């Protein structure tokens, strides 16, 4: 009975699952997913991820070039400049690809675990076949000449060679290899194919008669090539001969040899390529192309290997592409110019074009019909490393004030460049940016320094591994932001340096080291706020607020977050200016601006804490709500005025990962999200419904922006690629309709009453939201977690800005900000429906509509059923509110650019076809109507000498080389004869031969049976995970490509295993603790480069209290490029009067009992990174502080010692009297209350947990008697510094390190540096009042900081203390001291401090240990620097000078130590104590000996 019931239940369940309703639901779900992915299409890819010749291919019939870009295959037509795309649905990176001989199909290999070999229909761009027989990545693939078979070779830990009959979907032959394989090539007659790799040339033979009859996998027969003298080489690429040389096989070695093998697998001859390294090869019947280092491509004759010519090299690294407007400048490089390496080649036999990819991620297509006259058909330059941020150039009301053409956007990258792009109007640039002939999409490259090494992808084969390993991984630009008026570009790098560029001249107008760590977010305030502020947020948990209207003077520094700050935004809500910030401490702070003197101060009004890390934030255009992307993949929406959470919905379709970025569109209808699973999604902001999904990036998407015309979404990623997505016509029309209705409402409000000109002009430039077509209102109780999830503090009421314009607006009651207070989901649906259905009043109200919305709304609704591209032909392109349609007469001639004459309908229509032909990816039938604004940017330049679109160099510029330099060599007699015994020897099985493998039932020896291989080959990894931990089986495997993780996930021939895709994930993980991953093994790397503010963290390590907040100041940072001082390597030599352990930059001024005035000046970052000699000192352990400072302004900058200078001051101090009235005096001992400067909720929770487990006990102690902590040199080095960017989401967030409790202080000044480089200063925070507690003793006597120690050295904070009233002096008091006053670094006095010159200066054991640790760190840094500069094959003049300087220093140190042998080392401040002197001397002698040995070994190797 029971059995019967069970069977009945089972049958019922089966029937239920088979029911039509279930199938219908499944089909609907599948259709739903398909609809979501079809809403947004990939229109253009700006980037390339080709890692070798296997990632580039050409259709021999049509000339179509295919290359990999993340998870996308780009099919590019060089003649038409058109792109089509194949998206890999598995979300795995494309590593190898090849065309079929007829060009109809494309085969791709991918990386990751259990990769697939896929065959795609090129015309349909759809998958037709799939093979999953590899486990650890596919290294290379190839079609047979008959297109019947496909051969695929796995990566190092896969070791499988498969021959696949892809139409039958069976593997006909297979075998294993014991070496890393880098390339594969089929013979012309399809009888064999050849693989090349590390000490590996292998010929694999196919018996078509046998393989066609057997349906099971048969052993693949292989024979090794006889390498002879070249047996220890790495063969990077191989190609079988064609035509008369079909029996030959050509390959190249990484050492720069071109080799030819005969049909007997015998090394016949070779020729040197005269290059340092060779990467790729392409063979035709007429030519052999060899891609080499420094952009070199050599041409040889395949019949005899005679040298023919060398192709022109591409652009030199660091080239200003905006200046390359003529063909004569294209091929002209400087004497010391450096070029990228050629890493991939493919030849188009139809057009005789050669496509090349270089390791700076640039693509060139050369016309090689005549080798003596090579022309450039096409070129493009892309980012070579992780792209961190993207910003869209704003719409400017007055087009004549615009610095960039419409539809431009800006990106920044780890390659240390900021790039300006314009894909819409290629060739139509601004007055200062003429069209260039290097790239159709790239307008300008801003190089932040002269380090060209950062421009190369060092993880590619073309990268120099030695140089790449010594490169600081923290270089690069992390964030960018454009001012609302389009005039300034702010950028923050990964070292904490803030730069401001003028976009009109593209010159650097300001450079200041604002933070101790990377700047994660920059934000300008919108014009509607009535303020011109710039907020800078960093990993060092500080926010600096600068006044852009007052030459970027520092207004305030906010110190409320307890961990990295991930986002900061401005908003105008309820007549108040707000600042919202969120961070990895799970806190959200809402602040309100308050007028203070001549500046603005932000005070906290709400503080909300959630249970998950907050990674990004955006404010919707109504400025009433802010959306925050969280670690749990939810989007939380908060009311800006109240700080209450109003809504929560899922921000990702997947079940893994975390939200990294969120971005609202200009109308506020949609919000786009980026998840760490590499997917993009677009949601309806009001309902939370997903409306579109996208994929294609192979790394985390680090930035997104909607275009101003609502047609595109631009995404940037860690894979170095930029994707331009085309939104569906329905989405675009709905967004444009909302913007049109908003402008009409604003126009109606302006007619009812006067408005402040400042606010009114700002409202015109900013898109405010309107009602969406549908969607419920947000409910305040929709959060599943509830409001009790976090704590909320309402400490201060909202404080209005008491400016005149604000008072007028509040009095009139007609401010546009009042309209913004209505969010688009809170407007009446009935009213919205009436406006949508009856747009006639919209079109007839007020003056005639102009600009982008010249078309009435009813016409938009009719056109909504058409393709969006057809709408473009009927309406002007929406460039900005000031744009006029063709029916509007243009402005007067005085307002025009270089064109001068007015643009009529006829003239624009005549110019439209010419513009269209220069636009890539535009449909050929579209006629782009030029608006008046576009006419401003049109440049009637003389065309470059182009023949059929090909740029040819002048004859003198064509590089030539003597053919006698390339001598063909053959093996010596008998050297191969002994190895090649004839026919008998040829029958001997090679180590990789299938005969050495025991097959059972004609099946391949699988990785599950590794012992079946009789030879000692490297076993396969069978655990299903990346085998990075496996030890290589052979000694030469140290060249494996999977040893490191690249910045963008690009490995030299290595797969993208899950372990190797962790770079960006790890970056975001460490946002919570502000430390770098790695541990002690990477201490040296972390301490090599520190920001200047890190040094002054040592000055506050003994401070028991934080100082109260100070008001704003008028310090103007007005540095120009000609005033920016650069410091050479010679300026790093310390002064002879510097006491032991004191870096040169911490020298005190002379002992003058009177008060001193100082001159803060701008301190620039040195491009050569030679300020690392005190890196170990910068990492000194710090004492826990007993208070947390919540806000601090510029007046808390520590006054620096006066220095002689011949340059004018870059900082001027003004208007400080009224803002410092409440400051305590310098010598005062009273303690002021800290108002709201208490622990944050998040920090208090962490503090309680730390105390409970015994961590950071100093934070819980009373501030009156902090206990001194002994610091060992090893602890100093182990402290965290700057961080990589890593994200391991499941891990709990660690407690905040002690180092993050200190506020960054002003950077120090080197005495000898300032003498040579002029005045220097930095932007930071410091203490301006003295402490009232003892630093070393346990007594309670109130003393100043300088009295705390018996020997306050120059590196101690006491030595840098100045009274606050000194800052109140006028500019006339800020004069540099004479050199006589700074002679004695020991003599120093401060107000309230009596320091005797004859005081006993005892050198304790602790100070001795500290000195030894610093000495060891300095020596280590010097050795590392010496290795770095001597590793360059062609050092520059500066590097040679550095080398000589270091050698001389080493020699002088050795001589001094020899002279002092047996003597006691003395201290400049007095005789040392008996304890520790002998140990110090012994350590010095031992370490000096080790240093000399290392230098000698290095010199011997170099010689």
Swiss-Prot record:
Identify the GO cellular component terms for this protein. cytoplasm; mitotic spindle pole; nucleus
Q: Where is the composition biased (Polar residues)?
A: 905-917, 957-972, 1089-1129
Instruction: Kindly list the places in or outside the cell where this protein is found, as annotated in its UniProt entry.
Output: Cytoplasm; Nucleus; Cytoplasm, Cytoskeleton, Spindle pole
Q: Which residues are modified to Phosphoserine?
A: 1193
List the Pfam families hit by this protein, alphabetically: WD40_MABP1-WDR62_1st, WD40_MABP1-WDR62_2nd, WDR62-MABP1_CC
Keywords of this entry: Cytoplasm, Cytoskeleton, Nucleus, Phosphoprotein, Repeat, WD repeat
User: One GO biological process from the UniProt record?
Assistant: negative regulation of canonical NF-kappaB signal transduction
* Entry superkingdom: Eukaryota
Write down the InterPro entries for this protein, in alphabetical order.
MABP1, WD40/YVTN_repeat-like_dom_sf, WD40_MABP1-WDR62_1st, WD40_MABP1-WDR62_2nd, WD40_repeat_dom_sf, WD40_rpt, WDR62-MABP1_CC
User: Which residue intervals correspond to the WD repeats?
Assistant: 89-130, 133-174, 176-214, 271-310, 337-376, 382-431, 472-511, 514-556, 560-601, 609-648, 654-693, 696-735
Q: Where is this region: Disordered?
A: 745-817, 874-917, 951-1176, 1217-1238, 1369-1391
Tissue specificity, in the record's words, reads:
Ubiquitously expressed. Highest expression observed in brain.
**Predominant subcellular localization, coarse grouping:** cytoplasm
Subunit info here reads: Can form homodimers (via C-terminus). Interacts (via C-terminus) with WDR62 (via C-terminus). Interacts with MAPK9. Interacts (via N-terminus) with NOD2; the interaction is enhanced in presence of muramyl dipeptide (MDP). Interacts with MAPK10.
Q: What role does it play?
A: Negative regulator of NOD2 function. It down-regulates NOD2-induced processes such as activation of NF-kappa-B signaling, IL8 secretion and antibacterial response. Involved in JNK signaling pathway.
Domain statement: The N-terminal WD40 domain is necessary for the interaction with NOD2 and down-regulation of NOD2 function.
Query: What is the protein's name according to its record?
Result: Mitogen-activated protein kinase-binding protein 1
